[in-house]
Amino acid sequence: MSSQYLRIFQQPRSAILLILGFASGLPLALTSGTLQAWMTVENIDLKTIGFFSLVGQAYVFKFLWSPLMDRYTPPFFGRRRGWLLATQILLLVAIAAMGFLEPGTQLRWMAALAVVIAFCSASQDIVFDAWKTDVLPAEERGAGAAISVLGYRLGMLVSGGLALWLADKWLGWQGMYWLMAALLIPCIIATLLAPEPTDTIPVPKTLEQAVVAPLRDFFGRNNAWLILLLIVLYKLGDAFAMSLTTTFLIRGVGFDAGEVGVVNKTLGLLATIVGALYGGILMQRLSLFRALLIFGILQGASNAGYWLLSITDKHLYSMGAAVFFENLCGGMGTSAFVALLMTLCNKSFSATQFALLSALSAVGRVYVGPVAGWFVEAHGWSTFYLFSVAAAVPGLILLLVCRQTLEYTRVNDNFISRTAYPAGYAFAMWTLAAGVSLLAVWLLLLTMDALDLTHFSFLPALLEVGVLVALSGVVLGGLLDYLALRKTHLT
């Protein structure tokens, strides 16, 4: 058994998996934590830094164009490698261009480039996930996933901790971004050497097959809206704690960028890897629900470490302990959360549904930034991190509400169709669609504003209305799900 498990590690495509995983993880920090550190050092105000987290909306909305990348094939290197190559070349150019800018004087251009990087990175993730699924046989997907996750974490480590250290000690911020762009060259070579899948699912022939059928299947379940809320809320406390961690450690506590890079980025990512692996081991002994509950409690409680940092004297070991424990528990929660997403996918529509669910899981990480910046300025760091502990509670309560259907799906490997409240669900769906449309318009206008093509003063209000309308639709659907579940008796 062990030799069969290790066989994939001896094959040439394991190196390609590792390098492409690295390419997938590299851009994320360059538009989030590392960029946040650069703006902090350049004395950009806290609200602007928090607002910059919105550039990651591509990770939230990637499900909108994921069917198109499945439907259409580029004229070079095939359906999977063609899209991989295109996104990687665009990433290289955009990241290199970021190195020519200064946050203090060219903030709008920097925002526009960050949006482009996030869009190309999210698109690369879509295709890489599909390529892995197509290339790896079923018995090798576990080991293949481990290799790609290792590459992903290494990419985050390089663009996070190592990048901060290089920027602080050797290259400066602009030179560091040029180096990060150059690191994509081996990834492009790996894409050229990668095999194009030969035994793939047939390409969708119609828009209905590519887009509508997977969504109809998911929203036809009796717990679909509660699941949407659970996915958004389960890691909300973790998202709050992590949204301004770099700024907190540099500006709030007083550590320099090099110390934060070594401890928060490097030690933190290593702790996340250990937590994910240990969580996977524990999940062999626990049911999915129990793992989600225990790990969710731990990841919420671990945010108290940052609260202690905010009320005690500055000490490097205290920062190390808080960062390690929070990321360890966060990694355990992530392992259970990924298992939840896999359980929720119908195998007939796994690509589009996984893109939808994983995109929703990024909602907290993207949208808490502006709220977090406002909260800290209004109430201070200590109150903010206490609030991040409390923010984990709604997700745990919702998990308890969903327990019955989660256990049913895990045991029976199928889903229960919805039969009650059809008119109410239709209204909830239209409300959600209206909110998402408003957010899409807001993102388009924000990009035009960043390029100095237009200037709209109503953009903050449009964002608030879009979020409020979308959340209203999800909350209404969740309430209808709760009422329907009370009528359902599962065996």
UniProtKB/Swiss-Prot annotation:
Cell cycle is among the record's keywords: no
Consequence recorded when altering residue 151 to D: In non-inducible mutant SN0301-1
Topology of this chain in the membrane: Multi-pass membrane protein
Keyword presence, Lyase: no
This protein's GO CC annotations: plasma membrane
Activity regulation note: Uptake is inhibited by carbonyl cyanide m-chlorophenylhydrazone (CCCP).
Domain of life of the native organism: Bacteria
Primary site of residence: membrane
Keywords: Cell inner membrane, Cell membrane, Cell wall biogenesis/degradation, Membrane, Symport, Transmembrane, Transmembrane helix, Transport
Gene Ontology process terms (BP): cell wall organization; peptidoglycan turnover
Residue intervals passing through the bilayer: 12-32, 48-61, 82-105, 107-124, 222-240, 265-284, 288-303, 328-346, 422-453, 458-485
Endpoints of the signal sequence: none
Chain ranges on the Periplasmic side, renumbered to this chain: 33-47, 106, 241-264, 304-327, 454-457
Annotated localization: Cell inner membrane
Function: Permease involved in cell wall peptidoglycan recycling. Transports, from the periplasm into the cytoplasm, the disaccharide N-acetylglucosaminyl-beta-1,4-anhydro-N-acetylmuramic acid (GlcNAc-anhMurNAc) and GlcNAc-anhMurNAc-peptides. Transport is dependent on the proton motive force. AmpG is also involved in beta-lactamase induction.
PANTHER family: MAJOR FACILITATOR SUPERFAMILY DOMAIN-CONTAINING PROTEIN 3, SOLUTE CARRIER FAMILY 33 ACETYL-COA TRANSPORTER -RELATED
Protein family (similarity comment): Belongs to the major facilitator superfamily.
Swiss-Prot/TrEMBL domain comment: Four hydrophobic segments are not embedded in the cytoplasmic membrane and form two large cytoplasmic loops.
Protein known as: Anhydromuropeptide permease
Organism of derivation: Escherichia coli (strain K12)
